[in-house]
Amino acid sequence: MKISFLLLALVICSIGWSEAQFTDVKCTASKQCWPVCNQMFGKPNGKCMNGKCRCYS
C-alpha cells in the first residue's frame, strides 16, 4: 500500500517537471523572470532558481 502511494506521488510530482522550461537569463529575484517568461513563452509564470529564470506553462 505504501509503495503504490509513493509511486502515485512520484507520477503527480513529475508532471510539473515536464512543463518547466529553462532559460539562460540570469536573475536574483523571481519578479525579474516574469517579463522574460512572458516575452519568450507568452505567459509570465516563472521564478528564479539557482540564478537563472525558469518558466512554467
From Swiss-Prot:
Annotated site (Basic residue of the functional dyad): 47
Keywords linked to the UniProt accession: Calcium-activated potassium channel impairing toxin, Disulfide bond, Ion channel impairing toxin, Neurotoxin, Potassium channel impairing toxin, Pyrrolidone carboxylic acid, Secreted, Signal, Toxin, Voltage-gated potassium channel impairing toxin
Aromatic residue of the functional dyad, annotated site positions: 56
Signal sequence, renumbered to the chain: 1-20
Annotated positions of the Pyrrolidone carboxylic acid modification: 21
GO molecular function: ion channel inhibitor activity; potassium channel regulator activity; toxin activity
Localization of this protein: Secreted
Gene3D superfamilies: Knottin, scorpion toxin-like
Disulfide bonds: 27-48, 33-53, 37-55
Coiled-coil blocks: none
Tissue expression per record: Expressed by the venom gland.
A GO cellular component annotation in the UniProt record: extracellular region
Domain of life: Eukaryota
Keyword field contains Ubl conjugation: no
Family according to the record: Belongs to the short scorpion toxin superfamily. Potassium channel inhibitor family. Alpha-KTx 01 subfamily.
Domain-related comment: Has the structural arrangement of an alpha-helix connected to a beta-sheet by disulfide bonds (CSalpha/beta).
Function: Potent blocker of both large-conductance calcium-activated potassium channels (KCa1.1/KCNMA1) and voltage-gated potassium channels (Kv1.3/KCNA3).
Record's protein name: Potassium channel toxin alpha-KTx 1.15
